[in-house]
Amino acid sequence: MIKFNPIKNKHPQGALKNNDNFYFEVFIKDDFYFNDFKIIIKNEYTGEHISKRLEFKEKSRENYSTYHVTFEPFNTGLYFYHFEVHFDSFYVYLKNDKLDGKLVNSKEELPDWQLTVYDKNFTTPDWYKGSIMYQIFPDRFKRSKKYTAKIAKNENVRIRHENWNSIPHSSITHENYGAKDFLMGNLLGIEEEKEYFKKLNIESIYLNPIVESPENHRYSTSDYFNVDPYFGTNEQFEKFCKDFKADNIRIILDGVFSHTGSDSIYFNRYNNYDSIGAYNSQNSPYYSWFNFINFPNEYHSWWGFDNLPTVIKENKEYSDFINNKDSGVVNFWQKLGIAGWRLDVADEFPDEFLDRIRESAKYYDKDALIIGEVWEDATNKISYNTRRRYFLGDQLDSVMNYPWKNAIINFVKNKNAEDFTLEVLKLVENYPRPALDAVMNLLGSHDTERVLTMLAFDNPEDVPVHERPTYKMSNEQYAKAKELLKYASFIQFTLPGVPCIYYGDEIGMYGFRDPYNRLGFTHNDKDEDLLNHYIELSNFRNENKDDFITNFEFIYTNNKCVAYRRNNVLCIINLDSKAHFIENYSGEKLFGNNEIYSTPFGTVVPPKCYVAIKIK
């Protein structure tokens, strides 16, 4: 009766700039009689509704007519829309059914479509687009013998592992577990592997926190202005950034600004610092940063972990401490040479705080990168009852792309091409182009099971917890997971955005959730076949870099096979046990695990194949 899909029938496609004119086209069957047909658009921030009639445009094929409606530019914001069809005495509604339009009797039956309108001046760093990123958990990458770790202020609670291959402590293996055991990875260890990163065509390294902290994850900040003494010194870090940038590799730091550590200059619960911390006195210069329920032992903390007292982000003194353009934490580390930030738990920050982080970071370096830890669609996220405006142009450049991580893994495991296509298109439609080109595409992180573990099991959570510390995959399990990872990484490297390799995934490391996804990098136990796959994949992406910036279009979705176009490159993933024919597209193979057969009319793709071709 009525055909509409915003991917095909909203122009321009995707999120709009606030200076874009735009229009919708709807195709209505000629024998579908109605009195009136309107689009209803709601401004999510103001509550204002806009109603406008669609007008007949022209007769089209197959007994359909085209109706359309045009709009002048909208203000920056988030909008939702649907269509209303008016008959003599009742209405029906055209609503969003997996992006396609579906007629329903009730407005509540299906969701509206989303329309994102962002600031026309919103830009993201060009140096980042088309590149490849690598994530390192600093304590677990490499321990250089050239650095001798200094004694820490809280040395008495820390545990140093002598054996690099030690299994990390956990609540399964140790009572009163507090993540205080260290493998002693350090800055010089990372720098010693620079040629390794160059071989993988890495252009940015995201480091989990490096500042002083008594815990190996270092999310419990003790001192915002100093590298942890186990990891290195500020002087070494400045040289580290400079040396890597000379080889076109930029450093991204983890910004942990939602909470501090209880064992810190600022809170000082255990008196390991010379400061008067908030825990020590209500006259402390830091007291107003924290929210005490019953001083000193009851206070708000992140998810109830008393080692992570939350800060009051609205507090001006704290906000200045982080964001002052001359003396703030953000500025301090950028002066030492970092190229940007990954903001931990971005949902915990009020909008005003995020605004200031962007202002501060871009003030020092207009090309600074700001990535947020957001686990959902960042354009419509609600946190603490507030609709967030991460991607309207004045906060984040990018987010960790967990929705596509899940979509990729589900696709290669379950082979449902339609579900995969839908999940990809949702973000293509909602994300501003500058953000889409910069989104951080991951398959795993320090907060998830490693990707090989995800691919080896239907559900890793089904594995008994007591088996996880020393779990070894069977050869059959590993071979299956590795083969699926090759498909998954090909997709990761060819979708819009920037692929990020979590350290060790490329050499066959696997593991369950924290801390077993954070083992020491196995320098002497690498899967060379898998590593070569990643090297060749990164070479392919790097050699065709311009094709992987902007422009994305699905060409084919059928059963267990998808094909999408990135400018002059066609990427095909066929998980089916039979061949598929991609009509109208042929060319030379650039990368893949199988040969294709090109004809004047299209390309025959063999079963169980991932391949990229240069379109003729």
Model-derived segments and their meaning:
Residues 1-130:
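Glycan-association/targeting regions that enable binding to alpha-glucans and other polysaccharides
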Residues 139, 384-385, 437-473, 489-526:
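Aromatic/acidic polysaccharide-binding cleft in carbohydrate-active enzymes
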Residues 30, 568-569, 599-616:
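C-terminal beta-strand-rich structural cap/linker in extracellular carbohydrate-active enzymes
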Residues 132-134, 205-207, 251-253, 341, ...:
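Hydrophobic faces of well-ordered beta-strands that scaffold small-molecule active sites
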Residues 137-203, 210-335, 357-363:
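Substrate-binding/active-site clefts of carbohydrate-active enzymes
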